[in-house]
């Protein structure tokens, strides 16, 4: 793209300028506030879009996006960076798990959204059209929610378009988290970006409502490594990290309301047919035994004793 002003909504950053501001746009007739940084480097280069807070209680990723936005220096950036630290602000202030309180929907299941849809669909549509489509590359930062424990991993989506897929895989490797997962989550940020020919990844680190320094660092260091990979900052290519590529992401869900007792630890290697945990009814009688559908690695576990029908229990990467 030609080097010039960087504009998103009502905010503009001139070349060599870093600007923080809040975009406002109507959602169901009421003003919706979206804070962001625009960093327009002095030297030309690609545009990187970074978002967090799609799932608003994944605090390590939000803290990392805040830190990353604060540390960026336009004088040292080649290209442009857009950072949205908390996309789902109403859910963040409500300390909500998974869903947006405006309509009860999971924002990361409705992309690319609809301008005439529900509140979450309208938010997704504005962000997709005005923020994500401005980028040459896209990163969405996540982690375990308030009731999820996980091992760090990075997801990318294979679209079948070689240029996009190769670039997304290279981004995932450059980010530096050793576990990579090839997966499509319908309605997600990263798969919607990839389908729009924007190479994209979703990085996971942290969880359970805690923002530990190592989880925040996994995200901020990953973003710094990625910028070096994209030649957006000095330092040369990042040192390669030996990665394990998983081709599937298998979720197990509860068939009942009740209590959840995991039988394995997050990160554990499991075999096909192995018992992974049990769901009991209110009396404590076993109503479901969760069995691993494949040999693989446990990537996340719901850490809440309380479980509802259709809730995720855990996921196995294969």
What are these regions (language model features)?
Residues 1-318:
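Structured catalytic-domain cores with a bias toward divalent-metal coordination
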């Amino acid at each position: 793209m030609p080097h010039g002003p960087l504009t998103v909504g009502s905010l503009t950053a001139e070349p060599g300028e870093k600007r923080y501001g809040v975009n406002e746009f109507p959602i169901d007739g009421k003003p919706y506030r979206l804070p962001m940084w625009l960093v327009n480097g002095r030297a030309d280069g690609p545009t990187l879009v970074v978002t967090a807070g799609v799932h608003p209680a994944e605090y390590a990723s939000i803290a990392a996006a805040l830190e990353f936005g604060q540390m960026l220096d336009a004088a040292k950036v080649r290209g442009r960076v857009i950072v949205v630290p908390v996309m789902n602000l109403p859910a963040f202030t409500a300390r909500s798990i998974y869903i947006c309180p405006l309509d009860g929907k999971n924002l990361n299941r409705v992309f690319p959204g609809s301008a005439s849809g529900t509140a979450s669909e309208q938010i997704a549509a504005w962000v997709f059209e005005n923020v994500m489509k401005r980028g040459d590359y896209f990163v969405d930062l996540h982690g375990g929610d308030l009731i999820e424990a996980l091992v760090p991993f990075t997801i990318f989506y294979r679209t079948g378009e070689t240029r996009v897929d190769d670039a997304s895989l290279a981004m995932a490797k450059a980010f530096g988290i050793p576990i990579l997962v090839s997966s499509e989550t319908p309605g997600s940020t990263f798969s919607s970006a990839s389908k729009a020919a924007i190479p994209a990844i979703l990085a996971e680190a942290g969880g359970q409502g805690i923002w530990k320094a190592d989880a925040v660092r996994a995200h901020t260091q990953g973003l710094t490594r990625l910028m070096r990979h994209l030649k957006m900052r000095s330092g040369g290519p990042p040192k390669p990290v030996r990665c394990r590529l998983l081709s599937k992401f298998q979720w197990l869900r509860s068939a009942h309301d009740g209590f959840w007792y995991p039988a394995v630890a997050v990160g554990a290697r499991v075999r096909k047919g192995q018992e992974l945990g049990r769901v009991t009814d209110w009396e404590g009688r076993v109503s479901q035994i969760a069995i691993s559908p494949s040999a693989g690695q446990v990537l996340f576990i719901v850490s809440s004793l309380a479980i509802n029908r259709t809730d995720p229990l855990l996921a196995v990467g294969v």
